[in-house]
Amino acid sequence: QTFGQENFFLELQNHGIPEQQIVNRQLINWADDFGLKMVATNDVHYVKKEHSHAHDSLICIGTQSQLNDTKRMSYVPEQFYLRSAEEMAELFQEVPGAVTNTLEVAEKCDLEINFGELHYPVFEAPEHFTREGYLRHLLAKGMYKRYEMDVRVDGEKFIVERVVDPTKLPTYTGLKETKDQPDYKPEKAMEDTEIAAAAKVLTERLDSEMSVIEQMGFVSYFLIVGDFVQYGREKGIACVARGSAAGSLVTYLLEISNVDPIRYGLLFERFLNPERVNPPDIDIDFADDQRADVIEYTRQKYGRECVAQIGTFGTMGAKSVIRDVGRVMGLSYGEVDRLAKMVPNDLKINLTKSLEKSPDLKQAYDSEEVTRELIDTAFVLEDVSRNCSVHAAAVVIGAEPLYNVLPLKQDDEGGTVTQYAMNPVGDLGLLKMDFLGLKTLSVIRNCCEMVKLTKGIDLDVELLPLDDQDTYDLLNKGNTVGVFQLESGGMRDLCRKFQIASVEHITALVSLYRPGPMDLIPDFIRRRHGEVNIEYPHALLEPICNETYGIMIYQEQVMQAAQILAGYTLGGADLLRRAMGKKKVEVMQEHRKLFVEGCAECNKIPASKANEVFDLLEKFAGYGFNKSHAAAYAIVAYQTAYLKAHYPVEFLAAMMTNDMGDTAKLTILIEEAKQMGVEVQPPDVNESRVVFAPAQGGKVIRFGMAAIKGVGEVAVQQILTAREQGEKFTTLYDLCMRVDGRSLGRKVLEALIKSGACDCLGLNRASLFGLVDKALSRAASVAADRSKGQTSLFGAMDEPENIEITESDMLKEWPISERLLAEKELLGFYVSGHPLNPFEWILKHYSLGNSKTIGELPDRSMTRIGGMISAIQQGFSKKSGKPYAMITLEDLEGTVQILCMNENYDRYRHLFEPNKTLMVIGEVNNAEDRPKLFPQELLPLEDAPKRFTQQIHFRIPMNTF
């Protein structure tokens, strides 16, 4: 009755399962009894009948079982494939109407998916504004904020009325002190031809961008993005647009982007091209710990039913499908690992190419029956979706409830997630946005907040001077640990060699330091220092490539060259750039013809020279970088470098807070603090806060208690609350009685003691550790009495200061080695000393260098370094299959990697023990970011004097006799 009898069918299936035959007979009887129609269906799980074994393996992968498990889930018999019409007719020959009824059902189903239409939510403009008018109103306000220029909106034009400070105009070349001249009047500024010309550059660019945005129907898009970005800014959530969106003046004026596209020569057409009708794509980085707040705002503004995160599907690649199929077949880890490692290390390679390129894999496939079965199954499952998860950043916003447009599901936390991936969501014309999380923005915010607390200075990183010499000095010394995009060893070396003097230089280095263009770096450095005469294939390329010393680094340069030399529109030049990047031969031939003809027509350039330039553009387009993206990140890099140069304590504290959960990174940052003369004091229950923070008394950072392994933020907050409500803790009993016992449990208390955070409580660590049970028990008893409103039986005796510490409570302190081991485990660094301190005299007299100086040695030179093994990673070489060991050797300055393989592995493997002290003689490898040492000899550190002492000199004063 609900659906109408004509729309109600009884479903019949026949997969050779006996129970189905029983069910089908009953369904046929019901159909006769109640006058219902039947329809024959087929439960399809794989396309071909021969794929049943592969499907069985896939079920095992999903249920984490093995094929030989008789109790596992399975689809038996092998009948769940896509049958032909003839097969279905034969299966249901007793009820032929059930087969023909499938056509009736199909005709009743009507789903039309409209592609090519936009379904963006409509932004509701304030009263008295159209959407277009409101966007122009916001842009006029942005003109004043960014350029101190009063602009009036007149229809579709922006009219400049006042220029408060002409020096804020990016193309103004007049006096820097113009606004301070006694006769300067802002309302008369446009009468000055230089000021008028500089203002015109901005208004014409804005008119042009708005024309394209309106023509393509994206006004609501920019209002929506501008709205949630503005919400973020009002809430103090740092954000920055990445990618080609930074090339738009509109995004800059709406404060979506922080990059002035006029100053940095960025192109709008690289972002939004009227000749390539694609929706705009603005990727925005938010401070990673506040990103969820902005997503929640969009849910509240547009409705929870209209906003969802986008699903993503993990597929099985060549290596992973071999591992998965091998596991369900019951093969050993070693055997599966052997086969997987035969697949070349190429993320895009498939099994067919792997068999062509890997002789070992081909031989195993041809000669080993089990391997052939595994790979034949893997062929069927390769690229099949293995799992569904939530995209790290992508969000879709619809104009109506999303369940009307696409399939949805709930994630583990109850959030709404699409069952379509990113591209199909875009094909449906829905608004998809990337809300990305960037830790660096959290670091910048936290650093500025600390500067406000410690120095009373309100910092706005968007207003920092971009010509600060201290900042460039820091970069050029290679002191870039913690500096966004510039902190790798290779980047530090590049900064030192290049000598940065502007944000444009940082932009170039960020663009070059990638596979492909890295080969250009040595020549780029020589050109920077005037060691190479810069020549241009054509004089018209000089203004385009002058900024990058005659080398094309950016995609935008390719576009400008096509525009200036061959008369392309910038939109057409963007199509050329894309064609060059995709290397489509036929399209490239068409563009070459257009380019050569355009060069001749516009600039009378001969065909031979035009073809030469085209070849050059084609070469650079293959690896050219998006300048808008590079400039956006270069500014963030500069901001972090500025903060580190001027506020090192606050910056390093913010960095350490950011990496509290990463012991390896914390160790690097603590070492960096040491190099900068900043002391990192150990945790202290009376002094530390949740996070790392500047301490009183100069260049000092206090270790954050939440960074102690096993403690956690909840417990630390309870400690801080108790501390703020009273005085400092005086004893372990005092600590336990004042802090909520539900947070301060045994494991937390033991971690605090072993890390040294309770050293201020009057007893050594062994004694404190021994009192844990007593203190927690006494605290629990007192808390229970208080909750009942009772006074303790012992009254004042239960006050912490009155609890007597007996002689039996006073234990002998743990050995220094035990304390150091606990500190390293819980904090990531040593507090009470260093295990190598007893060997300091050996390191001083018998080491020829240390972990800090090895990077300065010539490549392939010999050296001798002593230290202690802090980590060992063992494995098998992908080339030879032989074992190797990667040893992290720690000395008093830091760590260095020791790669031991071949005969040296067998000779010295007995020395590979954690905390073992060694002297290593070997060859330096400085070819990669991090120096390595290939050892020729290893020996126990204590044997170094006997091995390397050649002479002993005795000096005996004469008066001894």
State where each predicted segment sits.
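Alpha-helical scaffold/interaction cores of sigma-54-like transcription cofactors
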Residues: 1-797, 873-876
